[in-house]
Amino acid sequence: MADEGDILTDLDLDPAAGGNEPPNGRDNQPQVGFLTQYIKDLSVENPNAPASLQWNEQPQVDLQMNIGANEAGEDVHEVELKLNAGAKAASGVLYAVELVYAGLVVVRNIPDEQAHAFLYAEAPRILFPFARTIIADATRDAGFQPLLLDPIDFNALYMQRLDEKRREEEAAGGGAATPSAGEA
């Protein structure tokens, strides 16, 4: 038997019975999660095939990345991970791959600064492995070695971007800017 003050007796297994119901039947608990993920845009160009498939030169690979988030409905945001990968050699362009991989994310009852961090750091971190696989498959299907992208530290990129923005605001304002809540 559990004693008074025991961890098991202190659990409120039926919060509705304790009068903790959300007002008007609305859930007021924080909620974050993906509804779905999808390829929004995919373009693969192999402009110099079939000659480029026989080039023995070491290509220069360029990767550009961008992250976007837009409101798609009440408490729903579309997060886009945009990746442009290209390979060039002295003989010409081997391939160009453009991918927009997106996800619909529910963000409910979360403070704005935490929601922003989730949409621009954590959600892209979750989407990236799927986008990485699509890029690798696309380059392989174009006749080249699969382009295996290294993991990306989206949290570090997010913090770096916040720091850059703060410095820009300080420079524009002539004084020290007060960081928003949640910025480090």
Where are these regions (language model features)?
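N-terminal intrinsically disordered, cationic/polar leader segments
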Residues: A2-I126, R132-A184
